[in-house]
Amino acid sequence: MAGAVRGMLEPGGMFGDFRVLKELGRGGMGAVYLLKDEETGANYAAKILYPEAEIRDHKDAVGRFLREAEIAMAVEHPNLVHVYAVGRDPETRLGYMIMDYLPGGSLHDLIMKRLVLKQGPLPIRQSVTLVRQIASALCAVERSGVVHRDIKSENILFDEEGVAKLTDLGIAKRTNAGPKDMTLTLTNVMIGTPAYMAPEHLMDSKKVDIRSDIYSLGIVLWEMLAGEPPNAGLTTSELIAKASRRKRIPDIRTKRPHLPRRIVILLRKMTSPRAEARFQHPEEILTFLDEYAERTRRNFQMFFAGVAAVSSAVLLLAVWILLRAH
């Protein structure tokens, strides 16, 4: 939607108790603004729906907007974007959602920046840390009876300290969805981002569950380690055809040959084309990563113990040689 949208917020103006600082971006349903609380000085992000005349399916857009706010306010976790308020401004009649402002950009931005600067893909340790944070968020999502359905690097944002936050619950689905939720879900045929979708999601969006989110997070891990998603460049039709044959994504070692074996196993387990062969719950990812960290720690201890033993032996040999010489 090019140019200014009539009736939207203007930088420098007021929106309730907030000063509008600037527009952060736009999407198909609305725009996001940076707001400042005039009383506390704190910054927030505000997602504002376009006026009714600007959105073709305004009723559905409002439904998705309110559902995102409802789910986000119901699911609390340090690695989920927090929504503080939702409503309709009495003066402008614009629908709004006030949430955390995350100045660190997205994971997608970080990956692209590293490639532009020729720094290569993300380090293993950083990639594992980020997967741990989002898997932890998924634990809270699952406990709340929700499936995210659109986990991708663009929906993982960073705060000022570099902590990852999962956002965009606009197409999330409750596992106990009623008829109203199903109507919202089925408005569009394709729900989510095809390059990150699990095979069952690509073939039938009604069959997704938390294991589909785990698959998508595995694709994000592959992207962090390789610099791009494994199926980059494939069309949606090609992705669906591949999903129907239950074909695995390419081996990460074709892009990064010297990855630790346990990381390769983690990726294969997260991205199995068959849901029953994946981790069944995000807690299992955390357990796997705990075991990986402990194994790595023990290996380092054994390595340094070996180095110390060799150093001691060399020192003793040197002393013995000196004594023999005298």
Residue ranges: model-predicted function:
Residues S136-V146:
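Protein kinase catalytic-loop region centered on the HRD/HxD motif
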Residues T92-S106, L110:
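Conserved short submotifs of the Hanks-type protein kinase catalytic core
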Residues A85-G87:
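A short, aromatic-enriched beta-strand patch in the conserved N-lobe beta-sheet
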Residues T167, T193-E294:
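C-terminal lobe helix-coil module of Hanks-type protein kinase domains
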Residues A31:
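Conserved N-lobe ATP-binding subsite of Hanks-type protein kinase domains
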